[in-house]
Amino acid sequence: MTALIHLNGPPGIGKSTLAARYADRHPGTLNLDIDTLHHLIGGWRTSQGQFHDLLRPLAWAMAGTHLADGRDVILPQYVCDLTQLQIFEQVAHDADADFIEIVLLDDRDAAIERFNSRDDGSEWTRHNNELVADLGGDEFLAGMYDRLLSLLDARPDALVVRSVLGAIDGTATALDRALETVRAQG
């Protein structure tokens, strides 16, 4: 069955990398990385430029259209707002698709360090690093991590996949196994 696969997790945990790999191995899958859509909205570089509220409705429409055509969508995006998550779930159900939640996790301190050590030289990464610093840096990231753990209590069907720094192949294999398990359960 067609599915909207939501890869949740703290910033820098590997969501985008794993989603891109998954989409490459599954032709026709839409890699709906919302962070790549920011460049389409004027003013995204400003520190006040928090455009997720503008982009999520676009993502819902894109996901719904792709799912309705019978194709999978993988969504690598940190989402801890229960209402936002439920909307993505409803988009999947409206298209007669499954909604599969995978949460990528590392230890809290390791997750924070992973965010702080990533630097691909891109304008987006610089912008994101500045934004996080302006919001409180490590303390802000720790709060994001803690909210994600709290969300898991409200989302018992979400599967946790351990994301280990430097072990992208192993994490990708663990993700594939988790998805196989969910799909086998139907």
Question: In which residue ranges do the predicted regions lie?
Answer:
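Conserved beta-strand scaffold positions in the cores of enzyme catalytic domains, especially
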Residues: 31, 99-101, 158-162
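Pre-Walker A (Motif I) flank of P-loop NTPase domains
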Residues: 1-4, 71
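Glycine-rich phosphate-binding loop used to anchor ATP phosphates in small-molecule kinases
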Residues: 54-95, 99
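Hydrophobic anchor at the beta1->P-loop junction of P-loop NTPases
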Residues: 7
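Conserved substrate/cofactor phosphate-moiety recognition/catalytic segment
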Residues: 13-69
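P-loop (Walker A) phosphate-binding loop of NTP-binding proteins
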Residues: 10
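Small-molecule kinase domains that catalyze NTP-dependent phosphoryl transfer to phosphate-bearing small molecules
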Residues: 120-171
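Conserved phosphate-donor/acceptor-positioning beta-strand/loop module used by diverse small-molecule
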Residues: 95-116
